[in-house]
Amino acid sequence: MSVTVSSPAGRSFHISRSPYKKISKPRVIIAAVRSGVSLAVAPILTKLQKDCATPLPVLRHVADAMAVDMRAGLAVDGGSDLKMILSYIDTLPTGNEKGLFYALDLGGTNFRVLRVQLGGKEERVIATEFEQVSIPQELMFATSEELFDFIASELGKFSQSEGGKFEMQQGRTREIGFTFSFPVKQTSVKSGILIKWTKGFAVSGTAGKDVVACLNEAMERQGLGMQVSALVNDTVATLAGARYWDNDVMVAVILGTGTNACYVERVDAIPKLPQRMSNSPETIVNTEWGAFSNGLPLTEFDREMDAESINPGEQIFEKTISGMYLGEIVRRVLVKMAKVGGLFGGGYVPEKLVTPFVLRTPDICAMQQDTSRDLEAVESVLYDIAGVKSDLSARKTVVDICDTIANRGGRLAGAGIVGILQKMEEDSKGVIFGKRTVVAMDGGLYEHYPQYREYLQEAVTELLGSEISKNVVIEHSKDGSGIGAALLAAANSKYEHDY
């Protein structure tokens, strides 16, 4: 079987790097001063709202197409835009797990180590504790051994501070759930080959190697009695963390800087799965849904942004619904309105505003929360970001733009969720819509943008109808991926039959 690349979804609401090629900055255009700014801008806003519209037929098409692409991706590798990657996670936490387990979350310039003491059905999570460690910049360009030795050393220091409610059973090896948020070919529940480093890392001697082996060997060199029992991505860990508390969780979605979704799939519904690879009736499938593109309502601003990105024609769903891009789409609309419609008065394009990514999604979220009479928060953001003073008419237009882009993003995300649920329901009537089904959500975009959340829920309700949608619970699972990795270490422990 050919193995497919898995890549992480961003949970953070902070945009740390631009996904754009280096392009020359547009020249600042001085236009004639217009009277009646709102009239000049109105046609641009009207067209934007029309192009971004997501009425029920559009949502239904997106949901149906998502389900079709899922099936094609499950049939054969490369069968659709959706990679439908096998997680090799066949054993999910049940609540019976007991003991002390660790998690390591490596996904950027910081990594996090966590431990959890589990007490079985009665006590569940007795205690948790974590630390965040910054990776020295020189180690981002060091050798594989140097980087993993540093990580193992910090793990060792953290493990030495055990005490109080944390107790390791005598004679046991400490087991770790390893969340590795870089492109990797997963080959088993505890092995995966690194494709390449991203996010500013250029570590030598790791590409093509098993990252679990690299970490295990480093821990051995440090003399630690620790080993990895589960390698997971953040979306899968989120599902596991939520499932531990609620057995009705069937889907997990991350909506942050990036986005992804995974779900519990029947093994007999995966034609590309090698025979006898799993003894379990179910496994978790990582959809990599950011690559979906079928029937999405796109604007001239989306197409322009995509063409200038480092991956044109790719990750179109992600570019319409995730935190990395919403602010950038709004910025591009504002540039056109300033250029063509004299939005900010004086008929000029603010120099700061022509810089890609200068307007972030947290900025448009903040503007949309402004309920003051004069939209003072909007005025402040525009002045700080664009360096211009705005009148009330311009501020109202900006809020309308933010709402239009957030509305489309939230509703398309909701349609994607329904597409996943729809596919599962078609395979087994009643298994999803005939009972309570939970979708666990994580990520800063979902957590911190209330209008986006509302639009997502609205779309789900519209598509499913009021009766069926009562059975579908969409709930926030804050930081579920951290504890989820430790829980997967417990669920896949070599000591699993000891409790």
Curated annotation (Swiss-Prot):
Binding residue positions for ADP: G108, T109, N110, T257, G444
Record region (Hexokinase large subdomain): 233-479
Listed CDD domains: ASKHA_NBD_HK_plant
UniProt cross-references to PROSITE patterns, sorted A to Z: HEXOKINASE_2
InterPro entries referenced in this protein's UniProt entry, alphabetically: ATPase_NBD, Hexokinase, Hexokinase_C, Hexokinase_N
Catalytic activity entry: a D-hexose + ATP = a D-hexose 6-phosphate + ADP + H(+); D-fructose + ATP = D-fructose 6-phosphate + ADP + H(+); D-glucose + ATP = D-glucose 6-phosphate + ADP + H(+)
Keyword Zinc: no
Tissue: Expressed in vascular starch sheath, xylem parenchyma, guard cells and root tips.
Record localization: Plastid, Chloroplast stroma
Pathway connected to this protein: Carbohydrate metabolism; hexose metabolism; Carbohydrate degradation; glycolysis; D-glyceraldehyde 3-phosphate and glycerone phosphate from D-glucose: step 1/4
Record's keyword terms, sorted: ATP-binding, Chloroplast, Glycolysis, Kinase, Nucleotide-binding, Plastid, Transferase, Transit peptide
GO molecular function, one term: D-glucose binding
EC number: 2.7.1.1
Segments of this protein annotated with the region Hexokinase small subdomain: 94-232
Binding annotation for D-glucose: T198, K199, N233, D234, N260, E288, E318
One BP annotation, GO: intracellular glucose homeostasis
UniProt transit peptide range: 1-30
GO cellular component: chloroplast stroma; cytosol; mitochondrion
Predominant localisation class: plastid
Enzyme class: transferase
Residues covered by the Hexokinase domain: 39-490
Function recorded in the entry: Fructose and glucose phosphorylating enzyme.
Family membership noted in the UniProt record: Belongs to the hexokinase family.
Record-given protein name: Hexokinase-2, chloroplastic
Species name: Nicotiana tabacum (Common tobacco)
Gene: HXK2
